[in-house]
UniProtKB/Swiss-Prot annotation:
Transmembrane segments: none annotated. GO terms for molecular function: nuclear androgen receptor binding; nuclear estrogen receptor binding; phosphatidylinositol-3,5-bisphosphate binding; phosphatidylinositol-3-phosphate binding; protein-macromolecule adaptor activity; signaling receptor binding. This is WD repeat domain phosphoinositide-interacting protein 1. It comes from Mus musculus (Mouse). GO terms for cellular component: autophagosome membrane; clathrin-coated vesicle; cytoskeleton; cytosol; endosome membrane; phagophore assembly site; phagophore assembly site membrane; trans-Golgi network. PANTHER family: WD-REPEAT PROTEIN INTERACTING WITH PHOSPHOINOSIDES WIPI -RELATED (PTHR11227). WD repeats lie at residues 184-224, 230-269, 312-351. The N-terminus might form a beta-propeller domain involved in specific binding to phosphatidylinositol 3,5-bisphosphate (PIP2), leading to the association of the protein to the membrane. Association to the membrane can also occur through binding to phosphatidylinositol 3-monophosphate (PI3P).
Length: 446
């Protein structure tokens, strides 16, 4: 999930971050600023370690890291139509591609890299960056809203199917075919996301009051959650936990909502033969005679847990991650801070804020500046990659740190027969051809 910080209105301090995103398995955070971009590891609560930082590209508004690999994709306001792919550990550019209009968002997994423009989506094979398909004539999508399953065995893509309603188009990124359309909401879509296996799809409309979860690829509604009733809000991020047990939503308000995916059963169990059980049964029966909108509201589940922010109105993104063996709620905001909360997976309730990190102070924390007394960290990655490097052999036969490809060559397809490259291993890297590309019409279209 990535967010681009909006321009500050008169009287408000300009956002410190231009963009920020968690990687696919929520183990890393990337931020973009006017000076460049930074990558952080999320392996510890107390200490925020900066993995890499670069000032070579100014005014970054999109930065995406592929899992925990050395592949990072960057787009700058200085060249908003150009995508740059880097191997940050080596300090080298892998390739860059230019498109016909401004790039609005980028999504990637171990098989596919998607580039979303306002009226088209480009689907690349991440192994060699070959353009596989261009999805044209999509409804105007000015925010670049789209989602890609991180499960490379299906690589499902979801994007808005209408400008006026909440229709979702579900597309198979491997077979390059449309799977189905889902009538998710009456209003325009604001957020969509897949769970880690690609078996569920969650969505929210611009009203931000109701969040729905659908089965994939069937498109059947599984859950319906109500975020609130009093006011409409702008949902800024929507994300499943890696085990798909929870769904987290943040907005322009001061509250982050966490919903629990209760186990679905085919039939409701019999109520106990007590007065309260009888009344509960009568209550559920009565909902069948209420107007549809009221009946739906009565059957919507409320938040299992919440996180309270000390601000509202700022752009932010949230995620759920396990850090040091405990479930945590993480919120990154455009003011340049990362907030870490404890989540009680059994009882829910209000999450407890346990740490606040500054994302602009090179990995030191605000609350524990005495941590500077710890042993000094290794040299920065900028210094590391400047040293002569030796190629480290991979555990997969035929692969080196470069992915086994020489300059200008691509790994033969048969070398992938044993399975995809383990891109979460920093010693491996997708076998991408070093290239310069332009995508302005010479494409396979749909």
């Amino acid at each position: 999930m990535e967010a681009e910080a909006a321009d500050a209105p008169p009287g408000r301090v300009e956002a410190a971050l231009s963009c920020f995103s968690f990687n696919q398995d929520c183990t890393s955070l990337a931020i973009g600023t006017k000076a460049g971009y930074k990558l952080f590891s999320l392996s510890s609560v107390e200490q925020l370690d900066q993995v890499h930082g670069s000032n070579e590209i100014p005014d970054v508004y999109i930065v995406e890291r592929l899992f925990s690999s050395s592949l990072v994709v960057v787009v700058s306001h200085t060249k908003p139509r150009q995508m740059n792919v880097y191997h940050f550990k080596k300090g080298t550019e892998i390739c860059n591609y230019s498109y016909s209009s401004n790039i609005l968002s980028i999504r990637l997994n171990r098989q596919r890299l998607l580039v979303c423009l306002e009226e088209s989506i480009y689907i690349h094979n991440i192994k060699d960056m070959k353009l596989l398909k261009t999805v044209l004539d999509i409804p105007s999508n000015p925010t670049g809203l789209c989602a890609l399953s991180i499960n490379h065995s299906n690589s499902y893509l979801a994007y808005p199917g209408s400008q006026s309603t909440g229709e979702i188009v579900l597309y198979d990124g491997n077979s390059l075919k449309t799977v189905c359309t889902i009538a998710a909401h009456e209003g325009t879509l604001a957020a969509i996301t897949f769970n880690s296996s690609g078996s569920k799809l969650a969505s929210a409309s611009e009203k931000g009051t109701v969040i729905r979860v659908f089965s994939v690829p069937e498109g059947q509604k599984l859950y319906e959650f109500r975020r609130g009733m009093k006011r409409y809000v702008t949902i800024s991020s929507l994300v499943f936990s890696m085990d798909s047990q929870f769904l987290c939503a943040s907005s322009n308000t001061e509250t982050v909502h966490i919903f629990k995916m209760e186990h679905l059963t085919d039939s409701r169990p019999e109520e106990p033969s007590t007065w309260s059980g009888y009344m509960g049964k009568m209550f559920m029966a009565a909902t069948n005679y209420l107007p549809a909108q009221v009946s739906d509201m009565m059957n919507q589940d409320r938040a299992f847990a919440t996180g309270r922010l000390n601000f509202s109105g700022q752009k932010n993104i949230c995620t759920l991650s396990t850090i040091q063996k405990l479930p945590r709620l993480l919120v990154a905001s455009s003011d340049g801070h990362l907030y870490i909360y404890n989540l009680d997976p059994q009882d829910g309730g209000e999450c407890v804020l346990i740490k606040t990190h500054s994302l602009l102070s090179s990995g030191t924390t605000e609350e524990n500046k005495e941590n500077d007394l710890r042993p000094s960290l290794p040299p920065s990655y900028a210094a590391t990659v400047a040293r002569p490097s030796t190629s480290a052999a991979s555990t997969v036969p035929g692969y080196s740190e470069d992915g086994g490809a020489l300059r200008g060559e691509v790994i033969p397809e048969h070398e992938f027969a044993t399975g995809p490259v383990c891109l979460d291993d920093e010693n491996e890297f997708p076998p991408i051809i070093l290239c310069r590309g332009s995508q302005k019409g010479k494409t396979k279209q749909s």
